[in-house]
């Protein structure tokens, strides 16, 4: 008889208990294994059942992360552009402003916003010149008080930047020098790159000091057609000679491309454009630590541009490194692996999975600010006064496609803040607490910090000016018809309803591009094309009947094209996934349905959407704009003709082109905030309201969400380098996560009992069968013995 059969026929209780216990553990482990960091949790009920087990067997983050000075968070969309010349989307800024350092920055705590030197010794020195190139004796600090005649004398403004000595680039293989002092990684072949997937795979790295040439190189590089920088179109009208320089680079690129075609070189391996070889009047390196930028006329807002990533330094070695044949094929570029002098460096970039920023070992440690408001003091935002930044060792951000998964992991404590690049969760949590719904109980009990501010930005819908149906029109008659169509749609879009439903009334409907918080916003109370005054100092949206009347005048009575007899169809380009996005799309369809206009929805991911907008192939679109700097010029340029996205790669997404508007903009943009400037802004408002190239949408609140162990969270869509100032208390984090995610042990003991109860009848049946078999066998043996004796 085998040992197993002997056990089943006479089981040892203690051994049976061990087997049942092992089976129970296997069952628990299998159940807990269903919850993986990749899968996330798809419902709150699932979380209630499985979270205790997950905490015991399979936490979504490694334990060692929790005890370190790591910030743990998530992101929704993989950033498409991390190159300082091309990056301009909100979801890219947490990384670009952590790695790159423009010359200026904003004081992290002060409001109103205050510009400060970042890599400079002091703020830029301004010198004014007349048309003859002679310097003017005008004090820049008293410029606002100068007469119009004196200001009109200014033909050029020179910004002089003095760079701090001793600032170092991060370690990178582009800077490696061999024993002979030669750069050793700039003559690589595709064969040399066979096992390379990131710059961290190189065994040799180096670094060097920042100098003025790096800033000059970065500015000149904005003109290359290989990158298509969204800043070049506008800056080419401001930096002296930049437009002609762009034309020169365009021709040089065409020459190199033709040469490559003749030699059979593929497009990804075009010869490197070395911008050290090309100079122009607007950018001058005086010495290794001094740079001069020459601006046409008077443009006070240029100082804000110097705080943007477009003006971050680019080392020529890095540009040459990524231009080598084979790099693009392996997705090695400044778009995926940026290089800078900032507080962090990108050390992990797994597409659609995870991105990690690690402390730059060469960073000089700029001190945390010691000045702030009484409120900042009360909130503990000055506790880290004077400490060298960054205060974190790493920022680990995981790609999350499902909002439910983000919310669950955040409430459990495994994410310190829900999302790296967006402020919507903070506002949503505030609404939840206000209404007593959702996670309100946990948010209050776990002391989640929910600071909020008014966002300097807007969400808007726009028409493509290049489109034959909703755009400019080729004849005056067509232009008038198209305008009436746009006006009718503008009236039909009930943003008051939208704000009430989707924003929980925590947003403000806009009447122009000049949003709340900007100079000139109070100069015009409402949009007279869309609203009527109600006689009590308020206003109300015009009726749908008025919109239908305009639609008929546009040639589409009842939504039918009078000429063709076919239904009017509008193509709507948008981006977004999930039930929330679908609900909003349904709302848009409902607005068009009021006019009996059919809507063709072309929903796509954000990267493809950006490509469509760059090509000018959209007809009607939805997008947002967050201010780069707190000045109306930064919004009014969204309709400036030379800033067209399709024509010049700028940020005029509607490709709006109106000569009068452009003239007013060119005059307004150079002015200080005076009554004269406000009057020009009002005229521009009238034009955009009458022509209706946009539906101005709404401006929403912007809020952060941080656990109690996160310090220094102060949300702002103007200040983009927040990551350098955030801090965590790992000990408190570990303690709270342990408290909140204690495993419920009764299933641990109950499951083996249940398994034992299920197994025991089977064991009894087996034993009975064995007893019968044994008895039968003994009987047979007895009979055989009896037969032998006979």
Residue ranges and their predicted role:
Residues 706-743:
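Long beta-strand-rich cores associated with HINT superfamily self-processing modules
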Residues 72-151, 339:
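N-terminal lobe/hinge region of extracytoplasmic solute-binding protein
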Residues 107-110, 240-290, 294-405, 544-545, ...:
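Gly/Pro-rich hinge or "lid" segments in bacterial periplasmic/extracellular proteins
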Residues 344-345, 493, 508-554, 574-584:
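Structural transition elements
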Residues 55-60, 64, 443-447, 454, ...:
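Extracytoplasmic/peripheral linker and loop segments enriched in polar/acidic and small residues
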Residues 347-358, 383-384, 396-470, 496, ...:
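Extracellular/periplasmic solute-recognition and catalytic clefts
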Residues 67-77, 157-161, 215, 291-292, ...:
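Short, well-ordered beta-strand elements
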Residues 122-238, 292, 406-409, 477-488:
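Aromatic- and charge-enriched surface segment that lines or borders ligand/interaction sites
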């Amino acid at each position: 008889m085998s040992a197993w059969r002997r056990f089943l026929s006479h089981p040892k209780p203690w051994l049976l208990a061990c087997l049942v216990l092992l089976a129970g553990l296997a069952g628990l482990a299998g159940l807990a294994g269903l919850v993986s960091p990749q899968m996330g949790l798809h419902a709150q009920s699932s979380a209630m059942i499985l979270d205790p087990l997950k905490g015991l067997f399979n936490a979504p983050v490694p334990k060692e992360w929790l005890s370190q000075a790591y910030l743990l968070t998530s992101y929704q969309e993989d950033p498409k552009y991390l190159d300082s010349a091309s990056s301009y989307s909100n979801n890219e800024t947490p990384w670009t402003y952590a790695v790159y350092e423009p010359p200026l920055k904003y004081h992290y705590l002060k409001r109103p916003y205050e510009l400060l030197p970042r890599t400079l010794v002091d703020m830029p020195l301004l010198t004014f010149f007349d048309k003859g190139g002679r310097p003017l004796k005008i004090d820049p600090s008293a410029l606002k008080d100068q007469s119009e005649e004196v200001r009109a004398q200014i033909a050029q403004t020179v910004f002089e930047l003095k760079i701090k000595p001793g600032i170092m680039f991060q370690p990178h293989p582009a800077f490696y020098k061999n024993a002979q002092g030669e750069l050793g990684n700039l003559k690589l072949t595709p064969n040399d790159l066979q096992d390379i997937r990131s710059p961290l795979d190189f065994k040799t790295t180096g670094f060097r000091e920042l100098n003025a040439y790096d800033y000059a190189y970065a500015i000149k590089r904005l003109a290359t057609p290989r990158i298509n920088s969204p800043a070049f179109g506008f800056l080419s009208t401001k930096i002296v000679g930049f437009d002609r320089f762009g034309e020169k680079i365009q021709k040089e690129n065409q020459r190199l491309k033709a040469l490559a075609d003749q030699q059979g070189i593929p497009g990804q391996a075009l010869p490197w454009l070395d911008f050290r070889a090309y100079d122009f009047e607007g950018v001058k390196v005086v010495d290794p630590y001094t740079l001069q930028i020459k601006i046409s006329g008077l443009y006070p807002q240029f100082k804000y541009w110097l705080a943007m990533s477009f003006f971050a330094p680019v080392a020529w070695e890095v540009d040459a490194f990524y231009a080598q044949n084979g790099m693009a094929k392996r997705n090695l570029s400044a778009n995926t692996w940026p290089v800078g002098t900032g507080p962090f460096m990108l050390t992990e970039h797994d597409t659609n999975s995870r991105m990690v920023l690690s402390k730059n070992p060469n960073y000089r440690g700029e001190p945390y600010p010691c000045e702030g408001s009484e409120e900042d003091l009360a909130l503990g935002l000055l506790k880290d006064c004077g400490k060298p930044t960054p205060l974190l060792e790493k920022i680990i951000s995981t790609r999350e496609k499902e909002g439910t998964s983000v919310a669950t992991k955040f409430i459990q404590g495994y994410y310190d803040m829900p999302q790296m690049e967006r402020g919507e969760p903070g506002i949503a949590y505030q609404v939840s607490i206000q209404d007593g719904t959702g996670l309100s109980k946990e948010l209050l009990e776990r002391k989640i910090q929910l600071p909020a501010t008014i966002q300097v930005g807007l969400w808007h819908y726009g028409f493509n000016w290049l489109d034959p149906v909703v755009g400019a029109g080729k004849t005056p008659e067509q232009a008038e018809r198209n305008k009436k169509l746009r006006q009718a749609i503008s009236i039909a879009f009930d943003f008051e309803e939208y704000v009430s439903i989707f924003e929980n009334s925590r947003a403000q409907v806009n009447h122009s591009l000049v949003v709340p918080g900007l100079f000139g916003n109070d100069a015009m109370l409402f949009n007279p094309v869309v609203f009527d005054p109600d006689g009590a100092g308020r206003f109300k949206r015009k009726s749908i009947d008025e919109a239908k009347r305009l639609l008929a005048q546009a040639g589409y009575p009842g939504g039918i094209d009078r000429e063709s007899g076919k239904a009017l169809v509008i193509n709507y380009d948008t981006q977004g996934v999930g039930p929330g996005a679908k609900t909003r799309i349904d709302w848009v369809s409902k607005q068009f349905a009021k006019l009996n206009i059919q809507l063709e929805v072309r929903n796509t991911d954000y990267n493809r959407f950006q490509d469509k907008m760059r090509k000018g192939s959209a007809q009607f679109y939805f997008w947002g704009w967050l201010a780069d700097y707190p000045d109306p010029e930064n919004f009014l340029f969204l309709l400036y003709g030379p800033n067209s996205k399709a024509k010049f790669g700028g940020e005029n997404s509607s490709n709006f082109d109106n000569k009068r508007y452009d003239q007013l903009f060119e005059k307004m943009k150079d002015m200080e905030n005076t009554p004269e400037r406000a009057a020009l802004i009002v005229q521009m408002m009238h034009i955009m309201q009458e022509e209706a190239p946009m539906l101005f949408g709404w401006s929403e609140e912007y809020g952060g969400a941080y656990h109690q162990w996160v310090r220094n969270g102060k949300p702002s869509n103007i200040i983009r380098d927040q990551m350098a100032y955030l801090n965590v208390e790992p000990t408190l984090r570990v303690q709270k996560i342990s408290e909140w995610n204690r495993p419920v042990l009764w299933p641990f003991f109950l499951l083996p009992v249940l398994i034992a109860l299920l197994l025991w009848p089977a064991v009894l049946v087996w034993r009975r069968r064995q007893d019968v078999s044994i008895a039968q066998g003994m009987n047979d043996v007895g009979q055989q013995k009896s037969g032998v004796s006979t």
